[in-house]
């Protein structure tokens, strides 16, 4: 996985050994999403999942030391190439946690030789400091482990 920070953006890219349709399905199908969208030694519980333009998702990621809740508001979903959504920390009841920054995430998918797909994620934060706060929370390690889970699921 490659990662770079540009002002208020965090951009990472990773190539997965799977066709584009399978990778896209893993992001947009509840049963698949729950199996991989978490770091090693964690689990995901989806409470609501409608990964379409105008839809949303509410889920929890449980690690051995904590539970974090996320609200995703899907703006654009264009199968199998693009997902744009607003990602917010949430309360256990599914409301946005206004103490933490929301981010706009753009996921783009590109296929190579019908057997490999590169996922590029661009997260845009309200400020450079908000992006740095998320980096300091360990997003790089967490995303790398999460994408390891995706890679293992689709092999």
Residue ranges and their predicted role:
Residues 15-19, 62, 134-138:
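Alpha-helical scaffold segments that form or flank carboxylate-/histidine-based iron centers
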Residues 152-155:
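Generic C-terminal helix-cap and adjacent flexible tail
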């Amino acid at each position: 996985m490659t990662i770079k920070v540009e002002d208020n953006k965090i951009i990472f890219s990773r190539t997965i050994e799977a066709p584009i349709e399978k990778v896209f399905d893993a992001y947009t199908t509840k049963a698949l999403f729950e199996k991989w969208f978490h770091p090693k030694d964690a689990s995901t519980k989806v409470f609501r999942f409608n990964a379409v333009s105008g839809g949303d998702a509410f889920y929890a990621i449980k690690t051995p030391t904590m539970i974090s809740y996320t609200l995703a508001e899907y703006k654009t979903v264009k199968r199998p190439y693009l997902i744009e959504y607003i990602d917010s920390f949430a309360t256990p009841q599914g409301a946005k946690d206004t103490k933490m920054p929301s981010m706009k995430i753009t996921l783009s998918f590109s296929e190579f030789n019908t057997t490999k797909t590169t996922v590029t994620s661009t997260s845009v934060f309200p400020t450079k400091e908000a992006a740095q706060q998320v980096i300091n929370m360990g997003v790089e390690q967490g995303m790398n482990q999460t994408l390891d889970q995706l890679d293992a699921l689709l092999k």
